[in-house]
């Protein structure tokens, strides 16, 4: 813990094309080795592909996908009397968004298609339809929290 109070959170600037902070965070999540231009091209091309494939507004499809992959509950390890319990806790809104983007990027990279644009577009479309690996991760997280509901009284 810092001695001089808490460190202020840095505000993420909205992306130049869609004016969305969530898209900006997705770009930052996809970025490797500081190559933001490459990451922007991937995200914008993927959103254009989504627009073309679904016929819907890409930003709406992305927001629907994010709502389907952001977790409400998660488990945290809590040590009580020499035993570790998985205690279910609610996820803060900023962490929900961060986890959703992190899972989306990780499962996009793990997909089998050729090219990151194709992978990202398909993963976002799958997530908006409540299918795909990212949605499964959210459901698994919720199942884990549900299974450990008995330890909810250990919350801190």
From Swiss-Prot:
Transmembrane segments: none
Highest classification ranks of the organism: Bacteria, Bacillati, Bacillota, Clostridia, Peptostreptococcales
Organism: Alkaliphilus oremlandii (strain OhILAs)
Keyword terms, alphabetized: Ribonucleoprotein, Ribosomal protein, RNA-binding, rRNA-binding, tRNA-binding
An example Gene Ontology CC term for this record: small ribosomal subunit
The protein's name: Small ribosomal subunit protein uS7
Gene Ontology terms: biological process: translation
NCBIfam families for this protein: rpsG_bact (TIGR01029)
Gene: rpsG
SUPFAM superfamilies per UniProt: Ribosomal protein S7
């Amino acid at each position: 813990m810092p001695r001089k109070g808490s460190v202020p959170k840095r505000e993420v600037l909205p992306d130049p094309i869609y004016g969305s902070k969530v898209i900006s965070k997705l770009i930052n999540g996809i970025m490797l080795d500081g190559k933001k231009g490459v990451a922007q091209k991937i995200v914008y091309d993927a959103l254009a592909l989504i627009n073309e494939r679904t016929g819907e507004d890409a930003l709406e499809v992305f927001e629907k996908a994010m709502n389907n992959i952001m977790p409400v509950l998660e488990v945290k390890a809590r040590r009580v009397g020499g035993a570790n319990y998985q205690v279910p806790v609610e996820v803060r809104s900023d962490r929900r968004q961060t986890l959703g983007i992190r899972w989306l990027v990780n499962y996009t990279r793990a997909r089998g298609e050729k090219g990151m644009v194709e992978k990202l577009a398909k993963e976002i479309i799958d997530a908006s339809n409540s299918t795909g690996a990212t949605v499964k991760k959210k459901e698994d997280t919720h199942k884990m929290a549900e299974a450990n509901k008995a330890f909810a009284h250990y919350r801190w």
